[in-house]
Amino acid sequence: MKTVEVRVAGPPDLPKINKLIDMAVMNWPMPTRLKRLASPILQYDLVDLGFLKVFVATFNGQVVGVAAWDIATLQVLPNEAGGLFHGLYVLPLIQGQGVGKKLMSTVFDDARCHQVNGLLIKAQRVSKNYFAHQGIQALSMDEGDYPYKYWKALA
């Protein structure tokens, strides 16, 4: 989608961001009850905007994608320290058209500007193939809260 614009999100964007997250989660291949319970937990609020850098992708003034990273907290990894890629959601109807890739590039560029040498991505099972397809390095699986983790080196 060539006319998609990416910008930093602000408080007025939160209702649209959370509606988009809800639509994306409801499209996940899992039981409806689980999706209904998971969606509110994944949504952002004003407190999140205080410590996350959130970007929105817009098309004709509508929010069609969102990505966020934790600008304050450094994640310690075996050989590196970096930030946390917090979330990536794209309107289900336009997935596969480059919106997610554009949002990720924006997050990666912003992290580089903040001299972060890499980002840890904790992926849900439904999105693990997406990050692998993007060529992002998979880390070894574990039994923790997110068994699918990826490392995007930025340095």
Question: Where are the predicted features?
Answer:
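Conserved acetyl-CoA pyrophosphate-binding loop and the N-cap/start of the following alpha-helix
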Residues: I94, G98-T106
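Conserved active-site alpha-helix within GNAT-family acetyltransferase domains
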Residues: C113, R125-K149
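A short beta-loop-alpha structural element at the N-terminal edge
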Residues: V4-K19
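Conserved acetyl-CoA binding element of GNAT-fold acetyltransferases
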Residues: P78-P92, Y148
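A short helix-loop-beta-strand connector motif used in the catalytic cores of GNAT acetyltransferases and
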Residues: Y44-V56, L84
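Conserved beta-strand in the GNAT
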Residues: V56, Q62-I71, L84, Y89
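Conserved GNAT-fold acetyl-CoA-binding loop/helix
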Residues: D22-Y44
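Conserved GNAT acetyl-CoA-binding A-motif
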Residues: M104, A111-Q124
